[in-house]
Amino acid sequence: MISEERLLKVLRGPHISEKATMTAEGNNTIVFKVVINATKKEIKAAVEKLFEVEVKSVNTLITKGKTKRQGARQGRRSDVKKAYVILKEGQDLDFVGGAE
């Protein structure tokens, strides 16, 4: 059993992009930024507990951080893990919806 404290730390927030919006509209998929060491089971449990929806499947990917420089200084951006969470039919998750 995964602890409740761990479930609250797994999701960092929704990933908002043009591709994420298109998949949300067409495929009933939500994209989240998650901690780099999160597993698919933890992500599924966290989404089901926090948003009270049923998850069909979870796909993950890690985007490597880019090397950037500013003048003579050179640095590297952090790696980011994204989770594509596919919801079951009839399930809906709306981040923008307000009071009606």
Curated annotation (Swiss-Prot):
- Biological processes per GO annotation: translation
- Ribonucleoprotein keyword on record: yes
Q: What InterPro entries does the record tag this protein with? A: Nucleotide-bd_a/b_plait_sf, Ribosomal_uL23-like, Ribosomal_uL23/eL15/eS24_sf
Quaternary structure (record): Part of the 50S ribosomal subunit. Contacts protein L29, and trigger factor when it is bound to the ribosome.
What are the annotated GO cellular component locations? Answer: ribonucleoprotein complex; ribosome
Source taxonomy: Bacteria, Pseudomonadati, Pseudomonadota, Gammaproteobacteria, Vibrionales
Q: Does the keyword S-adenosyl-L-methionine apply?
A: no
Q: Which UniProt keywords apply?
A: Ribonucleoprotein, Ribosomal protein, RNA-binding, rRNA-binding
Q: List the disulfide bonds.
A: none
Q: What is this protein called?
A: Large ribosomal subunit protein uL23
The source's domain of life comes to: Bacteria
GO MF, one term, reads: rRNA binding
Check the record and name the PANTHER family matching this protein: 60S RIBOSOMAL PROTEIN L23A
- So what family is this one in? Belongs to the universal ribosomal protein uL23 family.
Function text? One of the early assembly proteins it binds 23S rRNA. One of the proteins that surrounds the polypeptide exit tunnel on the outside of the ribosome. Forms the main docking site for trigger factor binding to the ribosome.
